[in-house]
Amino acid sequence: MGTSSGSNHPHQMLPPRQQQRSGGGLETALSLVSSDQEPRRESPAESASSQETWPLGDTVAGKKSMSQKTEPDSMEQTVNVMHHVSNADKVSVRDIARERVELVAERMHRLPDEFLDELKNGLKSILEGNVAQSVDEFMFLQKVVQSRTDLSSVTLVRAHRVQLEILVAINTGIQAFLHPNISLSQPSLIEIFVYKRCRNIACQNQLPADDCYCDICTNRKGFCNLCMCTICNKFDFSVNTCRWIGCDLCSHWTHTDCAIRDGQITTGSSAKNNTSGPGEIVFKCRACNRTSELLGWVKDVFQHCAPNWDRESLMKELDFVSRIFRGSEDQRGRKLFWKCEELIDKIKGGLAEATAAKLILMFFQEIESDSAKSFENGEGGRLMAPQDACNRIAEVVQETLRKMEIVAEEKMRMFKKARMALETCDRELEDKAKEVSELKAERQKKKLQIDELERIVRLKQAEADMFQLKANEAKREADRLQRIVLAKMDKSEEEYASNYLKQRLSEAEAEKQYLFEKIKLQENSRVASQSSGGGGDPSQVMMYSKIRDLLQGYNLSPKVDPQLNERNPFRSNP
């Protein structure tokens, strides 16, 4: 924790692990990972780094390479490789957790790298899973590993590297040990497994850290006082923040949320600052059971870090301080609580974060000056020298002028901001008025176009009606002409049939006359031959008689019915 407002501590205890940020690449949170592995069982999301967020840079490329392994081509290649591995040589995560180290290591040496990567990915999916099945599987694996007595630094030396990474990931619940871009040495992995090295990859200190042999560092397996909370046993990478509280006396760190929740932040007097009142907010360290005042620590954090905070970070830090001093009974703590609440409201209303940071720093200066005044008045109220009084008055005047300048600058900035907003509104109104006039003109234009289209539609409708009337008349004329044509065709067919029959009848009469004359001639010649020579052939005479009778009968037959010839006008006579 930071120094008090009146102390001159040799180094400023800013939030934890500031000295480690420059050395490691993993600066963002691997989640808050618990080190209390014995009585309490947590889900992978609580005890493991299943919510880890990797930093930018090479580690992001590592994550991309991991995602590329899940593509179809890579998966198909992995499946093909796994098909070539016999069932006797295959190793599962449960085998690694249950079976002897040397037996599993011997089998894993015969396995291809693709199969080992698939094995690590399977465990990662279990650690990442939030479903009950994944949680139960992780709890089972962790229980099996932690219940084994043969896993020591001696036996783990013979382990395969992937086997050791899987065992460490199961034991700690941190999937970062399975990441391809994080490669720790085998001795480091063994020390992490047996709780002799901090499992925080960005810390990696030997345990106990700083040769601390307090109850917490001694009795909690894997606890590191440089990066882990004394209450929840988890670590993260938050620095330059009020999220962590450090003890002035033993330098152990605690989450502010955990301290508030467990009642470690309370009212009392500090063991280090005898000038603190009985109602001042103090922090009671769980490691050394001693108290440290928090007002000076908050002041130190804001003096060193507030200028670098953005808007969201500043609001979060003010909220932390407000929650810390909510129950304060002394005047300074109550003023700080009210000031934080006021600044949070102003920032939400549009106050710039730089101005808010200046105001809170000025507030701390006021509190310090008020404390100095109270201390001077408490020493008997001795009279000040004229020069000191003048200097003090000058300081007060300068401080007042500085405050007035800041307020004036803020008001001027707000005035300029309001004026710019007003000008923007005026421009927007002008633009909207132009848009309205354009819309009206466009609407009038559209209305004229609609009227023109309606007129054209009416004209086209009238033309269509006219053409329809003409079409009806043309159709009636066509029907009349068709009836005339049909009547003329019927009449011409009748005339043709009558003429044809008359022609055929005349031809038949001529032929009959011809035949009759021929028969008559033959009969005359026959009669002449009979008179001259005697009788003729009786059969021939009979034939001529029949022919004559037929011709006479044909001459007496009735006329042909014209209706029959109409139905078949081109029929030949028999």
Swiss-Prot record:
Predominant location: nucleus
Cellular component, GO annotation: nucleus
Subcellular location(s) per record: Nucleus
GO BP annotations listed: embryo development ending in seed dormancy; maintenance of root meristem identity; maintenance of shoot apical meristem identity; primary root development; regulation of gene expression; root meristem specification; transport of virus in host, cell to cell
Pfam families recorded: Oberon_cc (PF16312), PHD_Oberon (PF07227)
GO molecular function annotations of the record: identical protein binding; zinc ion binding
UniProt feature coiled coil, ranges: 416-524
Database matches in InterPro entries: OBE1-like_PHD, OBERON, Oberon-like_PHD, Oberon_cc, Znf_PHD
Zinc fingers classed as PHD-type: ranges: 226-291
Subunit structure: Self-interacts. Interacts with OBE1, OBE3 and OBE4. Binds to VPg of pea seed borne mosaic virus (PSbMV), turnip mosaic virus (TuMV) and lettuce mosaic virus (LMV), but not with VPg of tobacco etch virus (TEV), cowpea mosaic virus (CPMV), tomato black ring virus (TBRV) and grapevine fan leaf virus (GFLV).
PANTHER family with a match to the protein in the record: PROTEIN OBERON 2, VERNALIZATION-INSENSITIVE PROTEIN 3
Biological function: Probable transcription factor that acts together with OBE1 for the maintenance and/or establishment of both the shoot and root meristems, probably by controlling the expression of the meristem genes such as WUS, PLT1 and PLT2 and of genes required for auxin responses. Promotes cell meristematic activity via the WUSCHEL-CLAVATA pathway. Involved in the development of the basal pole and in auxin-mediated root and vascular development in the embryo. Confers sensitivity to turnip mosaic virus (TuMV) probably by promoting viral movement and multiplication via interaction with TuMV VPg.
The name this protein goes by in its record: Protein OBERON 2
Protein source organism: Arabidopsis thaliana
